[in-house]
Amino acid sequence: KAFHSVRKQGLVGDNFNNKDILSKLPGKTAIGHVRYSTTGESKPENLQPFFANLAIGGFACAHNGNLTNTYSIKKRLVESGSIFQTSSDTEIILQLVARSKKKKIIDKLIDTLYQIKGAYSLVILTNKKLIGVRDPFGIRPLVLGDKSGSPVLASETCALDMIGAKYVRDIENGEIIHIVLISWSKSNCLGINTSRTS
């Protein structure tokens, strides 16, 4: 299954006010992203979500927040042969997931989460799952909503209001929520160091 994308710079209302754009996209699941650039330049190649075709299937990731150890991770990845196409810290997440030796996507993601530090929330779409991740300290928000029986993940409840979805709950600190078809399941990222260093 292929991912289809519409990515534009600017305000959501300016770019997606024509319902024809969204109605032409096939499929029943989607992720969207609105972010002012805090890491990396405001250039078209830095627009999210980011997409990758991994050995285990398609992977799309939208990231809100900042990773604090990007320099050291990126240096290590480049020295081992990785090529970066953007200046966004989100691309580091894709690189780490792609290079993980784990077999399952959730295990690849957990392997990646052990390596990154910072304040973040992630929304990930694969061919079979919608996944939400909140950093171990819960600094960046992520909420679960429901729209007519379909799960929705958003960084703020106002996004739920805009699409007519009902707020269900906040995603917990360090939680990974994976949504498979119509079932919702949860696992926590146990073992991620949540101690603060000065």
Residue ranges with predicted function:
Residues 1-173, 178-180, 184-198:
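Conserved short alpha-helical segments that host acidic/polar catalytic motifs at enzyme active sites
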